[in-house]
Each structure stands twice: as structure tokens, then as C-alpha cells.
UniProtKB/Swiss-Prot annotation:
Name the record gives this protein: Major capsid protein VP1
Species this protein is from: Budgerigar fledgling disease virus
Compartments, record wording: Virion; Host nucleus
Matching InterPro entries: Capsid_VP1_Polyomavir, dsDNA_vir_gr_I_capsid, Polyomavir_VP1_sf
Domain notes: The N-terminal region contains a nuclear signal but the presence of VP2 and VP3 proteins is required for efficient nuclear transport.
Length: 343
């Protein structure tokens, strides 16, 4: 409901006041403890090649000889977005940490699947249009304060993944890799190197990460993909706490394989699509987990999680836009009106 101002004129509805908007450099702007930061970024797919496709999918006659090429195995995408340091004194009993509150995300390029004229295998005895992308597909994403924890579970424990891909274990692999063997775990710390087919999110860990996914199988399953900018996923747990960004870093990962493309010779190629993220963060007061003695040790020990991910800094940064909100102001009739200068 609108509020009454002077006389009979209604007051505008109060909404968060936009403090500043821009690229990754906006994160350097100092903001108050009650400010809200929104980061827009995207992750490119890693189906095998950087063009969004894999090379031809090969099949071995015997499982014990399975050794796929590195360019035909879809892998997880991941990145770390650096956040500004918000604590001037880390010896205090309490600290401020970035907390991921909500995310809007969608797969980009869904409409490209309608292409039926670019050399695909033709329907109706070679007289119809080309088959669109179809078959097995997976859609997955995660948002966390540290890298995603992974648990191995393979279809064939004899599969050998060539370098630089990272498969479960080293050397001779146990057959228990085909079920849940807790000896085969990892962290998603490198972009495009962890095969989706043998690594899944670890349900026993990931307390500081929220992940979501679904898979549809079948050799010719038609793709069913929805896209909208109105769906928000809340990242808070049952205690009202979202992922806390350790080391002032926000970690994103994705796996979006829309199916396979079939050429006119019947050869199949995986097709990957990029994913867009819009994450809202706030500042959360937490108990200082680092005693003074630990701070001294940290001079010699790297305590912060690291990741070799997609570019989120520099000229090739995949951060689309950053918004910082602080305080409240009257609702404007135009969404894109320039923000008021900070007082």
C-alpha cells in the first residue's frame, strides 16, 4: 500500500537504493554494513571443446579398453569471483563475511536448439530437416563459499581418462569406484578438467555450498528447457544462513549438456550451453574463527581455498554487472533511472 505524504499526495513505495552499478571494479567501492551486493556472471560450457561441442564420441568394443579422448568428455565448469576485503581488524572477536543469499540462474542459448539446417542427420528418409539436439542431458549448478566437494561414482572403473582430465584415484582403480567408495573424493578446483560422468556432488559434505541438478536419459529424448528471469532460488539453510564466502571468494560451478548433435554420417557430438548467474550477497557478522596464534601461522600457511577457473577478472572477465544497494529510497517510475549520489 502507498503511504500518505504531505496533503493528500501518496508517498512512493520504499525500495533498496542503488548506490553504484558497473563492472567487476564496482566491488572496490566501500559500502555500509547493511548494503546488498548483486553480482551477474556467466560460465562457459566445457563439453570437450571451447566451441560448445565435443569431438566425435567414440565407443570401445570392450569395457576394459575404454580410454576416451579428452575432447569428447564433458566436464564441469567452475570459477571463483573475488570479493573485496571487508575487515580492517581481523583480531576482533567477530568478523564480517560475505553471505550468498539468493541466486537467479538460467541456461543461455536454449533457442539455438531449433536449428534444423546446419548439417545434421536428416529426418524422413533424408528429405526432412535435420534432427535437433536430443538425447541424454544434464543441468546442474552450484553456488558456495568454497569449491564444490565431489564424490566419484563410475559406470566403468576400468575407464582411463587421459591427461589433463582428472579421474578418480591414481594408478590401479578399485571396482568399488562403481559404487560409493569414500576413498575417491575431490574438490572442484580446476575448470574443465573434472569429467561429469564420473564425479558428482558429495552429499556428505558441501555444507557451505548449495547445488541443484537434474538428468534425463534416453538415446533420443527431446530437450525440455525452461527459461525466465523471474525465478529466484533462496540459498539460506534451515537456520537462515547462506553460504559464507571463505577468503572473500564466491565459487560457482555448472554442468549444462543439452544432448547430442548427430551429423549426416550418424556421428554424435555432445552439445553444451552456457549458464548465467545473478547472485545477491550481504554482509554477515560471524565469530572470528582465527585466534591470534592462528593468524601468525597463516603467514606461512595458505588457508584460503583456491581454484583455477574461468576468468572473472581483467579484460576477459565474465562478470556482467555488479550492483550495490544501501539504505532505502522512494520507488522510481523508471527502473533504469540514474541512482542518486551517495550522501
Amino acid at each position: 500500500m502507498s503511504q500518505k505524504g504531505k496533503g493528500s499526495c501518496p508517498r512512493p513505495q520504499q525500495v533498496p537504493r542503488l548506490l553504484v552499478k558497473g563492472g567487476i571494479e564496482v566491488l572496490d567501492v566501500k559500502s555500509g554494513p547493511d548494503s546488498i551486493t548483486t553480482i551477474e556472471a556467466y560460465l562457459q560450457p566445457r563439453p570437450g571443446q571451447k566451441n560448445g561441442y565435443s569431438t566425435v564420441i567414440t565407443v570401445q568394443a570392450e569395457g576394459y579398453q575404454d580410454a576416451p579422448h579428452s575432447t569428447e568428455v564433458p566436464c564441469y565448469s567452475c570459477a571463483r569471483i573475488p570479493l573485496p576485503t571487508i575487515n580492517d581488524d581481523i583480531t576482533c572477536p567477530t568478523l564480517l563475511m560475505w553471505e550468498a543469499v539468493s541466486v537467479k540462474t538460467e541456461v543461455v542459448g536454449v533457442s539455438s536448439i531449433l536449428n534444423m539446417h546446419s548439417g545434421a542427420f536428416r529426418a524422413f528418409n533424408g528429405y526432412g530437416g535435420g534432427f535437433t539436439i536430443c538425447g541424454p542431458r544434464i543441468h546442474f549448478f552450484s553456488v558456495g563459499g568454497e569449491p564444490l566437494d565431489l564424490q566419484a561414482c563410475m559406470q566403468n572403473s576400468k575407464t582411463v581418462y587421459p591427461a589433463p582430465l582428472i579421474g578418480p584415484g591414481e594408478g590401479e582403480r578399485r571396482e568399488t569406484a562403481q559404487v560409493l567408495d569414500t576413498g575417491y573424493k575431490a574438490r572442484l578446483d580446476k575448470d574443465g578438467l573434472y569429467p561429469i560422468e564420473c564425479w558428482c556432488p558429495d552429499p556428505a559434505k558441501n555444507e557451505n555450498t548449495r547445488y541443484y541438478g537434474n538428468l534425463t536419459g534416453g538415446p533420443e529424448t527431446p530437450p525440455v528447457l525452461a527459461f525466465t528471469n523471474t525465478t529466484t532460488t533462496i540459498l539460506l539453510d534451515e537456520n537462515g544462513v547462506g553460504p559464507l564466502c571463505k577468503g572473500d571468494g564466491l565459487f560457482l560451478s555448472a554442468a549444462d549438456v543439452a544432448g547430442t548433435y548427430v551429423d549426416q554420417r550418424g556421428r554424435q557430438y555432445w552439445r553444451g550451453l552456457p549458464r548465467y548467474f545473478s547472485i545477491q550477497l550481504r554482509k554477515r557478522n560471524v565469530r572470528n574463527p582465527y585466534p591470534v596464534s592462528g593468524l601468525l601461522n597463516s603467514l606461512f600457511n595458505d588457508l584460503m581455498p583456491r581454484m583455477t577457473g574461468q576468468s572473472m577478472q581483467g579484460s576477459d572477465a565474465q562478470v556482467e554487472e555488479v550492483r550495490v544497494y544501501e539504505g532505502m529510497e522512494g520507488l522510481a517510475p523508471e527502473i533504469d533511472m540514474p541512482p542518486k549520489a551517495p550522501r
